[in-house]
């Protein structure tokens, strides 16, 4: 990474020191106007139970990746972001740092910016700071599945962009991607909506599912800004996704599954982490692997595992540029802008390591 690009680690971002600093008496106003709408409410656990059962019944067994993203899981994922082996974080930050003015050029004053899977919002702060420096009035909506982590991130943002002086209006949605798409259909807003999906998160889904998600969001009339990873160095990918921090993150999903099920069906001591590359899907896959023969009893159902059998936890696609174009076209979208990471030292092929794309609905598609 270029020496003039700030490292992503740590909060607040480097520019935040110049932000407005309210005194203690204004703390109520600073946080009082924060709106967080919970679209999941009390149905979260109940909705995950059938997904867990269905995944264990399947021939290709898997658990919902949503199990990874509770408050503890997000904390463990932040440790991954700080790991030197996890190349994505600083590479994406460098790309955003170098191209942020071009990336936000299509966002006009009065527009709505919705971030999917907002996480800790460090990158968000850079983007909002740039929009504010351009004197644009923006309605920013952060969407994430964990309410506690979402509120924490929003308060960090509001400390930098206080409602009393900032041109950025901040709001939160506790929602899955499906919840968010449905909410956007019901709430089209008065201006254009740009959806921001960073961190290679779209690539947690196989290409056909990724296309369906893009289609569902484009159908709301929004455009998308996607950040994706095109690394083709399998050794580099393994170091990034199979280290100790990743293993803790993935295995935490079993603890969360027990919480959701209200049982101790998954004894973490009986499972190990396994990572491998799936060449057919251009994806790295993480699994829970049985350390011995196991019998799981969940409700009235019994699931038998032989030693070494696996349950898939999460995937991460590493798609070259032509594959990204195909995925977007399958969704009825057209990639109109590319911002590429210029560092070609990553990967055993000449595929560039990372890029952001702006996707609009194809005017000639059905």
Swiss-Prot record:
Pathway: Secondary metabolite biosynthesis
Signal peptide from the UniProt entry: 1-18
Induction: Expression is positively regulated by the fumisoquins biosynthesis specific transcription factor fsqA.
GO molecular function: methyltransferase activity
Disruption outcome: Leads to complete abolishment of isoquinoline alkaloid production and accumulation of a series of benzyl pyrroles, including fumipyrrole.
SUPFAM superfamilies per record: S-adenosyl-L-methionine-dependent methyltransferases (SSF53335)
UniProt name for this protein: N-methyltransferase fsqC
Protein species of origin: Aspergillus fumigatus (strain ATCC MYA-4609 / CBS 101355 / FGSC A1100 / Af293)
